[in-house]
Amino acid sequence: MTSDSSDSRPAPAGSEPRQSPPRRALEWLFGRDVLTSPGAAAESPVGDPGRSVQLRLALLSFLMLFVELALIRWLGANIVYLSYYSNFVLLGSFLGIGIGFLRARSRINLFPWTPVALALLTAFVLRFPVQISHTSGTQLIFFGALKTTGLPTWLMLPVIFLAVAAVMTMIGEGVARTFVQFKPLDAYRLDILGSIVGIAAFSTLSFFNAKPLAWGIITAIVLLVLSGTRIGIIQFAALASLAGLLTANSLISHDLWSPYYRITVGARTQAQTIPVMVNGIPHQAITAAAKRPAIFYQPYTQAPRNPLNNVLVVGAGTGNDVAGALRMGAKHIDAVEIDPMIYKLGTKLNSDRPYQSPRVSAHINDGRAFLSQTKKKYDLILFALPDSLTLVAGQSSLRLESYLFTLQAIQSARAHLVPGTGVFAMYNYYRTTWLKDRLADTLDVAFGHAPCASSVGQHQQQLSVLTVSVSPAAVRCVNTWHRPANVLPPSTDDHPFVYLASNTIPSFYLLTLGLILLASLVLVRTVSGPYRKMTGFADLFFMGAAFMLLETKSVVQFALLFGTTWFVNALVFAGVLIAVLAAVETSRRVVIRRPQLLYAGLLAALAVAWVVPQESLLSLSVIPRFVLAVLIAFAPIFLANLVFTQRFRDVSDSTVAFAANLLGAMAGGVIEYVSLITGYRALLIVVAGLYGLAFLTGRRKLTAAKAAQEGPAALAPTTALTAST
């Protein structure tokens, strides 16, 4: 290995090579790790590098997942387009991490530039936020669609995607340069442990409604610890700038942060309403019940004999609809609101003080989950403007309220109504006739007769109320809904995309995904070199794509069974990582003589998940539902990771193999949009097909592994890893 200094004389024993003044100046500015000698990573010993290096890898993995989660939350709150492109930031993250792993042995070390990239991305977003979403068609309805502010979609989305990929490339390269010093499974184990701590830390911050300033401070501290005395003045200045930008923004904006939204509370208007915006979109206005339009009270006036002994309000928000129910004489109200911060605003700012009433019981929960957990019967169930304006967890195309509007959800609500006189009502600014008709038809199918339908306002500001009863005689309709010839069928729990006008992938999604794939191909080739170095790991690529779909299926399954709350999603992701860790620990100790059996077991687990529809578990009580859901969802995940780890344990190049798997996960994130056509259950078929491709492309490796494992060591504790275990 040659020195970069012009002085070729060997350095004295026990001392570092002397550096030329220009190089010392560069190190002072940019840090001592920016330039790496060719092949330095390749020359690193592989084995047990020691506690300090183990801690470094775990800390790097913590940073990687923590920053990924922070970017998903923060960018989605400031760039409204991202609230509707479900996994846009996630795709950019996987691309970046994959490229970073492919660069593990590059001469130029990009990891020290992470603070600079983060500071630039933060400054750009704060300078050019997008406050209102915009679409150019009617295939997908965004209730928040008003008009565009900020940079246009065609410019903002590519910039954000490339910026996220750049940041995660730098962090991923830092992980990879340490990852390569370990045996593959030892490195993977530390990576998973760091990731588990990362998701636990971010979930804790979400629980305490921490602002982005806290996320930035933790990121800066971890980067300082990882850099140590090798940090350069530019990196230090960038970290200071990052903290300064987030501090200034926190002091100026006075935004509140819930686990779901960036919440902005406006000043009281002349009409004595208080506007509330989430993620830069007008969401609701806190208004006194006496000043609300009469149409909000139609569910009560159309059923004058309803005793209103028990009322359920789903989407209780800041309390407007709860106050309205109290005003109309409700004796007891269960108010369900998913966002704890929105609820707290209602307790403080609503002049009617509905949440302080002894007749009101507040529940911070998902509406569908509450219905599945209660046995109460209600005289009135009201879905009051349940429009989340956000998606679940940055993964899958679910919105927080998706499972409220399916046929099965309305049937569940009907089952909770008092026989004979119970009334169900829902209202919102539906903004398009086909959507209102679709929901009215859903009520018609669930109740067996057409609902009452009333509207006020025009165009996108038209407020519509749909009211129906168990018995047609229980309500007095001024206008009864009439089914048009071209009405769309009700959405279902398997295909819960009520805002999608047809079972297709909207054209703007197709265009965006196509450009993402094209950009990814170009970036991987340009930054990381020829594709041929990954050809030997095609099976790992397909495993990554399949596993991403399995993870998505788990998220949506638990969202249906236990609610779309942030806490449920955090538990699912933590559960996935724990299942992965269990597979790693198993493969570190046990060699499977016939990996083909693992594929067979995985196929059987997928078949069980197919045979037992997720909605069939809703009839069970919470504990048996949870046990069966965990078994059905996590058995395939555990077996899939046994397949992966048995293959990964003996790879010749762990970072390239891991990169192939990560890029496969990105491809899986693109394939996930097929669910808009097929529904989520059909993803199991796609998963089975992808693992079939992994089996076919990896047959030679399976044969070689079997030949190497023949003998008494098979299916016994592995001797090669004894020292590290």
What spans do the regions from the language model cover?
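N-terminal acidic, proline/glycine-rich, low-complexity intrinsically disordered segments
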Residues: M1-P10
